[in-house]
Swiss-Prot record:
Belongs to the long (4 C-C) scorpion toxin superfamily. Sodium channel inhibitor family. Alpha subfamily. Residues 1-19 form the signal peptide. One of its GO terms (molecular function) is toxin activity. Has the structural arrangement of an alpha-helix connected to antiparallel beta-sheets by disulfide bonds (CS-alpha/beta). Expressed by the venom gland. It comes from Androctonus amoreuxi (African fattail scorpion). GO terms for biological process: defense response. This is Toxin Aam3. One of its GO terms (cellular component) is extracellular region. Residues 21-85 form the LCN-type CS-alpha/beta domain. It is found in: Secreted.
Length: 86
């Protein structure tokens, strides 16, 4: 039984774990992508970056911005509390 657990853990580490998170997709300078409600722009942008879906949502301090669901870790998201540096 212990061997089965050890082999399972070894396979998990060898294969790797892909994680995803939800958030406002951001440009490299921590600026959000602005959007128009009910337009397909956010969903398209999010899906192009590996998310499962996206929508236009309100973010205090930034206005309307694209919110992505299940965005990969390698895609930047808005860091709340940090300013957009243009």
């Amino acid at each position: 039984m212990n061997y089965l657990v050890m082999i399972s853990l070894a396979l998990l580490f060898m294969i790797g774990v892909e994680s995803a998170r939800d958030g406002y997709i951001a440009q490299p300078n921590n600026c959000v992508y602005h959007c128009i409600p009910l337009s397909p722009g956010c969903d398209k942008l999010c899906r192009e970056n590996g998310a499962t879906s996206g929508k236009c949502s309100f973010l205090a301090g930034s206005g309307l911005a694209c919110w992505c669901v299940a965005l990969p870790d390698n895609v930047p998201i808005k860091i709340i509390g940090q300013k957009c540096t243009r």
